[in-house]
From Swiss-Prot:
Zn(2+) 2 binds at E145, D179, H216, E261. Keywords: DNA damage, DNA repair, Endonuclease, Hydrolase, Metal-binding, Nuclease, Zinc. NCBIfam families: nfo, PRK01060.1-4. Its EC number is 3.1.21.2. This is Probable endonuclease 4. It comes from Pectobacterium carotovorum subsp. carotovorum (strain PC1). InterPro entries: AP_endonuc_2 (IPR001719), AP_endonuc_F2_Zn_BS (IPR018246), Xyl_isomerase-like_sf (IPR036237), Xyl_isomerase-like_TIM-brl (IPR013022). The gene is nfo. Pfam families: AP_endonuc_2. It comes from the Bacteria. Zn(2+) 3 binds at H182, D229, H231.
């Protein structure tokens, strides 16, 4: 079973994200549980939590179909001790919010060394940050997203993801989300079926499909191996539709939320319908 949706707005309350997902006939969705560009947010009230859970029940979304994303401000590998602590506190809050909402996944960008510490040191800090957050929360899996490798962001090589996982003590509560645009920009080709075979074989060898907890399905405005993160609508970018058809037909991608973050929300319903049709072929 393929779970397909988009990252929908939670404007007006997290329960509104559920309704917006239903309106585009999504069978999965992503959301921010707080303002993604602010460090702090008001705690979730019992009323807000109850409305969200009721909406999920009404529209038949389980936690396996929902991939919340954390704040863009958080850097779990920050080289500065004070800034690192601030990020860790914010990440624990994000995990706790997911736990309160009955959600079992939290997607996040791993972190950046800011050209101040070695890659290995940054990756170790990220793993330690995850360990701290897992110890403070229950039932939520930390889902590391691969990056395009812009600036000093780590996570653009599968080896980075594997190194972080290696440092996480509770392997049952860590996973990865593969963003197709980020992978392509990071140097993993997806333009042909043969490219997809090679890229996902490498992913399986280095990380392992057992850790795959979600996908971000995005075409790329950016060039192959450019280390530039620019999303595009499916079939309109430099990846093309072949990769997305391949993913829809491959059972290794069953049972996880697959989320559009493509640039035109007006055609998300059409993109979802096309992906569903490919999954049926």
């Amino acid at each position: 079973m393929k779970y397909i949706g988009a990252h929908v707005s939670a404007s007006g309350g997290v329960d509104q994200a559920v309704i917006r997902a239903h309106e585009i006939k999504a069978t999965a969705f992503a959301l921010f549980t707080k303002n993604q560009r602010q460090w702090q947010a008001a705690p979730l009230s019992t009323e807000v939590i109850d409305r969200f859970k009721a909406a999920c029940e009404q529209y038949a979304y389980t936690s396996a179909q929902i991939l919340p994303h954390d704040s863009y401000l958080i850097n779990l590998g920050h080289p500065d001790a004070e800034a690192l602590e601030k990020s860790r506190i914010a990440f624990i809050d994000e995990m706790a919010r997911c736990q309160q909402l009955g959600l079992s996944l939290l997607n996040f960008h791993p972190g950046s060394h800011l050209k101040q510490i070695e890659e290995a040191d940054c990756l170790a800090r990220i793993a330690e940050s995850i360990n701290i957050a897992l110890a403070e929360t229950d039932g939520v899996t930390a889902v590391i997203e691969n990056t395009a490798g812009q600036g000093s962001n780590l996570g653009f090589r599968f080896e980075h993801l594997a190194a972080i996982i290696d440092g996480v003590e509770d392997k049952s509560r860590v996973g990865v989300c593969i963003d197709t645009c980020h992978a392509f920009a990071g140097g993993y080709d997806l333009r042909t079926e043969a490219d997809c075979e090679a890229t996902f074989a490498e992913f399986d060898r280095i990380v392992g499909f057992r850790y795959l907890r979600g996908m971000h399905l995005n075409d790329a405005k950016s060039a192959f191996a450019s280390r530039v993160d620019r999303h595009h609508s499916l079939g309109e970018g430099n990846i093309g539709k072949t990769a997305f058809s391949y993913i829809m037909k491959d059972a290794r991608f069953d049972g996880i939320p697959m989320i559009l973050e493509t640039i035109n929300p007006d055609i998300w319903a059409d993109e979802i319908a096309w992906l569903k049709s490919e999954a049926q072929c």
